[in-house]
Amino acid sequence: MEHNPDLTSSVIHGLGWYYLVLFLMNLWWTYRSYKVDGEFSKDIALIGGMPVATVWACVSAILMMVSVAHFTGTSSPESFLIRLPEWFKNPVDYYFADPVVYFAGSMLLFGAMVIYRETWVKDTFAWTMLQLSLVFMGLSMSDYDFRQIVGKPDNVPIVAMLFIVSYLTWIYFRRAVDNDRRIEEGRPLFEQEDNEKVLVWPDLVYTELICMVLLTAVLVFWGIGLEAPLEEPASSVKTPNPSKAPWYFLGLQEMLVYFDPWLAGVVLPGIILGGLMAIPYIDFNKAGNGYYCFKERAFAICTFLFGFFPLWIALIVLGTFLRGPNWNFYGIYEVWDVHKVKAANNVNLSEFFWNWPGLSSIYGGVPKGSDMLTILIREAPGILLIGGYFAAMPPVLGMTVLKKYLQRMGILRFFVFSNLALWMAILPIKMLLRWAFSLKYIVGIPEWFFNI
């Protein structure tokens, strides 16, 4: 017997409206495709010479039939067939509950986003990806556990954020790819073609007023449709499990898993803010000011997007949807079992080093003692590693892969830039070391409350 009903009549009926909206969206896209996209090449078998809109007309018809099936199939939810099968959900849960797979997937997705930008910014490709994600969302809503996570009032804005961020990223890359092509062909930039001045009053003010009214209406309907996520007064004898920070701090909360509070909660956020403020002063490339581009500022854009997507947005998604009770990893269709316990046998770098088979027989394992000299000897491998990372890497980078940047920035600006980049890289490095080797601290000095 299942632990809960995956589908009820009200859920099926609600999904019927959801698919009806998708049908209307694709009906509009069919009309747009008929006007814009033309026909398939005559060289393509079976569909050669056929309007491209025919494909979207078929998609619209399928979505309409799915919507009708939901409206007419509410009498017996147990036998309703349009749902995700277990053979699909189980592998997804298995792999998504693995942080290594999740992080590697986010890195691959980031790389594909940059490398294949000229492909996915095309209208038809982007629309196809949007529809696939919406259909996946609708099918996933047939699972009770997924629905509980996504439909939680606290998590609704996270789902909206994913689509909004994706849309804004698409807008940027679409304009950047277009301008890169214009620069190569010697044509005027997109921003230079329509640069007519617009009056603040009434043009700009009217536009802002309309946006204000629409956003106010959205917030009103949001407040009516979703209950405020208010909980009972805080109690020292009852702690929520999981106890999560607000969504905009989930990235920092995830960092607390891998670093001490002083580092994850104070130093790293301070470096992030300081780095953002330092960007105008260390940036030597004046290209790309006032217009979208990618190729002229590829390194700077990739660096920023790497910090924004894999190291921030991905951590918010991870903390929202994949972290459950006891801060364990759960799949998106998995039951959040409070009794699930995963033993963690984390060790410090000093234990790895001094217990190495060759060294342990000579020195007798990790040095014991609480005096300063013993502590420094014990943590010498980590101290040397961290010192070498921040002291030796900037010159090495400046003489090799970033030689051009050293020449154009100068020593001072380059060392500021390289150290900021090294601090940004330390988060994924520490995450991978924890997952691969169960490494807790590179430098662990609990006697001084100093751990890295």
Regions found by a protein language model. Name each.
Residues 12-38, 49-82, 93-144, 154-179, ...:
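Hydrophobic cores of alpha-helical transmembrane segments in multi-pass integral membrane proteins
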Residues 2-7, 86-92, 147-153, 182-187:
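Soluble extramembrane regions of membrane proteins in the secretory/endomembrane system
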Residues 183-202:
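Intracellular loop-helix junctions on the cytosolic face of multi-pass helical membrane proteins
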